């Protein structure tokens, strides 16, 4: 008996259908509050230093659509505003008692660091291919060696200090931004949909489709055209499948972080002949994303097979009761085969439905009002 990743919310004894909805409310509250704090932290210093005109320019840069990696101030605020998705969803899951936050990480209720380390080999292959494809035609070779082709790219429009600051900031912050999006779209959202739908296979399909659609729609404000949205959607679709196939977010966090870091670093010099504000995707770009994502999935599957990865939670789902879960159950799992009892269940009192449990410690009998309602 085991539980797939998208049903992990069903493992905790306190599961109720309304808890994810309550968690969404808490999540939005924390996230919106954090956006206010971030706005104050960035806008106030800019207003003091540059005045109203500086604030207006900053606001225009933030709302221009495509993200400009050559402006460290705008880039830092944008990335941090996404990074806070992670503590917001952590707080929501904990406050609403959906179970341990680690269950969003994997079926082992934690980050599987050993498995993540094994995913570095497929990631390295992906990195070489992505950098090669995205920088194709931008290098030239002459007597002095290999260097950027300025005839194609133009000249860098940023100083060495700005370039260094941008790259350091991207390398340090973008992995957390990528992880935050994975926990929200491929973690919380997929587990919510999967827990609501009683049929596991149907739930898996719907969870993948819904998370992919929401992920793609979330990028519409960036000004992407149809090919750009298809590009993002293809990435999200295959990432969702990888999560279900591996039972965790580790592989997709690495893939997402690599994708974003590569894009930002290659654009950081601000080449004069490259329009970094252009957000229109192309069918060629979509095919590259689709092909590299499929390749990464295949390599991850191979590594998972060779390493004997545990893809499912080694336990059972909490049975569905007609009434309130027993007071002594708390968050304990239903652990005995066939749903014959709660772990750590105290002795049953007269008139309480269910099997007689052995006396546990000095807890005493359960009160009649807190007994287990009859199972369907």
Question: PLM features: what roles do these ranges have?
Answer:
Residues 24-25, 110-122, 202, 253-256, ...:
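Interfacial aromatic "cap" segments that immediately flank transmembrane helices
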Residues 16-23, 74-78, 82, 115-119, ...:
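Residue-level signature of transmembrane alpha-helical entry/exit and packing/kink sites
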Residues 31-47, 51, 90-94, 127-139, ...:
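Short hydrophobic alpha-helical membrane-anchoring segments
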Residues 76-79, 101-180, 190-191, 195-198, ...:
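Juxtamembrane helix-loop-helix connectors linking adjacent transmembrane helices
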Residues 166-324:
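Transmembrane helix-loop-helix hairpins at the membrane interface
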Residues 1-100, 276-376:
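N-terminal, membrane-interfacial amphipathic/helix-forming hydrophobic leader that caps
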Residues 81-92, 120-133, 209, 213:
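Hydrophobic alpha-helical transmembrane segments of multi-pass integral membrane proteins
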Residues 11-19, 66-74, 107, 111, ...:
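Membrane-helix interfacial "entry" motifs
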């Amino acid at each position: 008996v085991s539980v797939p990743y998208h049903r992990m919310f069903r493992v905790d004894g306190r599961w109720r259908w309304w808890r994810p909805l309550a968690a969404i409310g808490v999540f939005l509250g924390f996230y919106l509050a954090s956006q206010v704090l971030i706005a104050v932290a960035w806008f106030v210093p800019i207003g003091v230093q540059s005045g109203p005109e500086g604030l207006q320019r900053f606001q225009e840069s933030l709302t221009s659509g495509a993200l400009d990696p050559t402006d460290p101030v705008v880039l830092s605020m944008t990335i941090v505003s996404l990074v806070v998705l992670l503590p917001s969803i952590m707080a929501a899951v904990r406050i609403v008692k959906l179970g341990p936050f680690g269950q969003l990480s994997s079926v082992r209720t934690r980050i599987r660091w050993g498995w993540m380390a094994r995913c570095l080999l497929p990631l390295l292959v992906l990195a070489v291919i992505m950098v090669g494809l995205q920088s194709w035609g931008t290098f030239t070779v002459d007597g002095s060696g290999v260097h950027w082709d300025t005839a194609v790219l133009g000249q860098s429009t940023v100083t060495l200090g700005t370039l260094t600051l941008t790259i350091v900031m991207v390398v340090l912050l973008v992995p957390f931004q990528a992880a935050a999006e994975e926990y929200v779209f491929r973690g919380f959202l997929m587990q919510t949909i999967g827990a609501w739908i009683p049929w596991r296979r149907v739930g898996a399909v719907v969870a993948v489709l819904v998370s992919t659609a929401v992920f793609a729609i979330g990028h519409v404000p960036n000004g992407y055209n149809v090919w750009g949205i298809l590009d993002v959607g293809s990435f999200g679709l295959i990432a969702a499948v990888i999560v279900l196939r591996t039972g965790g977010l580790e592989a997709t966090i690495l893939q997402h972080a690599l994708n974003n870091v590569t894009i930002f670093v290659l654009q950081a010099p601000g080449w004069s002949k490259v329009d970094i504000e252009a957000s229109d995707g192309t069918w060629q770009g979509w095919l590259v994303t689709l092909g590299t994502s499929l390749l990464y999935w295949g390599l991850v599957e191979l590594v998972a097979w060779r390493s004997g990865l545990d893809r499912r939670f080694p336990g059972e789902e909490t049975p569905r009761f007609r009434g309130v879960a027993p007071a002594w159950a708390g968050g304990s799992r239903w652990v005995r085969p066939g749903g014959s009892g709660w772990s750590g269940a105290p002795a049953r009192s007269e008139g309480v439905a269910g099997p007689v449990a052995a006396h546990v410690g000095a807890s005493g009998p359960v009160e009649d009002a807190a007994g287990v309602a009859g199972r369907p």
